């Protein structure tokens, strides 16, 4: 007991010392003739540590059970132990939690309806990687007004994920950095590493430590090798810098993630055809990896036309009916209202990439369920 008190006391003393050193360094820097630190930084704000949100919004037993089961089910799909089709479907990005919950309520009905053929997981993306500039997502700018209330954005993201899981809808998301997973990764059943970050060393290291299965997209130019290399890298242990739940800088040592797979999202040309799928599976086998892969119905595979997602789904369905067993999943961008808008004026419509509407969503899921039913029929 005394030893613990001494440790706590020493920790507090160190904090005071470090704070004093920092203030002294700041004062010195401000009076330097040639300042070299934080020259282009306008402001630094304190971020609430992950533990603050985890304490306020703790995971429930129901949510934990759903996440645990869904992760194992997806891992079984990746390793060929389950013959259902994983469907990652939902808005391109979340900007309105109310609309997201209405979408989830509708999707939950279809999740139960097709549970024997499809494993439906809602796409719940809070962060948007940008080629240049633009709205970066609910976490970065939750009020959509350029105030960048990130503390509120992180809380809103966790609150939505908790509600979704409590109602029985598992969630998926894209991971963009090394810090935000500490705030809500316990509520995620499947994660994605995007085409712009698959080749990044830190994202491969991050994936090696995530508790959920992870999909790596091929590069924006269609390069599949970088995704295959990423899977191999993520399966091994790594050390990298991140933060603890208490918000302190830390060295993270991972154990490696054996449940990663490729996502074919197209490049200069679409890559979802029978020939592309077979070629990708052969390359995965040659690399000593599972040949199971996912097809992204959007992005370059749809030639950035949301209406063509149905064409991709129809092609995938035909492959399933013909016995193609290496397609373990699809990804679809879908919302309550089809299309997109620049400002959030239409309820249930995307403000980032255009999505298919709800009627098409129902039609597509029925198509995929029927195709997979035929694929697994004796």
Identify the function of each model-found stretch.
Residues 94-112, 147-159, 314:
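Glycine-rich anion/phosphate-binding loops
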Residues 90, 295, 357:
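Conserved, mostly hydrophobic/aromatic
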Residues 333-374:
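Internal helix-turn-beta structural module
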Residues 86-96, 353:
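Conserved phosphate/anionic-ligand binding catalytic regions in large, soluble enzymes, centered on
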Residues 31-37, 117-272, 276-277, 299-300, ...:
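Active-site-facing alpha/beta catalytic cores
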Residues 41-78:
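N- or domain-start disorder-to-order transition segments that initiate the globular core
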């Amino acid at each position: 007991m005394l030893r613990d008190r001494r440790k706590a006391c020493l920790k507090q003393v160190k904090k005071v010392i470090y704070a004093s050193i920092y203030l002294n360094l700041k004062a010195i820097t401000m009076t330097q003739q040639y300042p070299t630190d934080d020259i282009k930084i306008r402001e630094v704000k304190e971020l609430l540590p992950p533990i603050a949100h985890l304490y306020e919004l703790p995971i429930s037993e129901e949510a934990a059970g759903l996440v645990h089961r869904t992760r194992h089910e997806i891992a079984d799909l990746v390793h060929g132990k389950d013959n259902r089709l994983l469907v990652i479907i939902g808005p391109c990005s979340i900007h309105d939690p109310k609309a997201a919950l209405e979408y989830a309520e509708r999707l939950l009905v279809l999740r139960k309806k097709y549970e024997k053929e499809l494993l439906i997981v809602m796409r719940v993306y809070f962060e948007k990687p940008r080629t240049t500039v633009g709205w970066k997502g609910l976490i970065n700018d939750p009020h959509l007004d350029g105030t960048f209330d990130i503390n509120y954005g992180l809380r809103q993201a966790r609150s939505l994920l908790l509600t979704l899981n409590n109602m029985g809808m598992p969630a998926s998301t894209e991971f963009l950095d090394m810090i935000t997973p500490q705030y809500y990764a316990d509520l995620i059943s499947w994660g994605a590493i995007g085409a712009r970050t698959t080749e990044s060393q830190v994202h491969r290291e991050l994936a090696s430590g995530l508790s959920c299965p992870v999909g790596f997209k091929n590069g924006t130019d269609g390069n599949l090798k970088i995704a295959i290399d990423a899977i191999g890298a993520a399966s091994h242990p790594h050390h990298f810098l991140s933060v603890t739940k208490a918000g302190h800088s830390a060295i993270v040592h991972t154990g490696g993630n054996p449940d990663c797979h490729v996502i074919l999202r197209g490049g200069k040309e679409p890559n979802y055809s029978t020939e592309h799928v077979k070629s990708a599976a052969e390359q995965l086998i040659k690399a000593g990896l599972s040949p199971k892969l996912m097809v992204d119905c959007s992005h370059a595979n749809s030639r950035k036309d949301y209406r063509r997602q149905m064409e991709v789904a129809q092609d995938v369905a035909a492959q399933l009916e013909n016995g193609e067993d290496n397609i373990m999943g699809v990804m679809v961008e879908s919302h309550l209202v089809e299309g997109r808008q620049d400002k959030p004026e239409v309820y249930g419509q995307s403000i980032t990439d255009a999505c298919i509407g709800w009627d098409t969503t129902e039609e597509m899921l029925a198509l995929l369920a029927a195709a997979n039913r035929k694929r697994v029929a004796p």
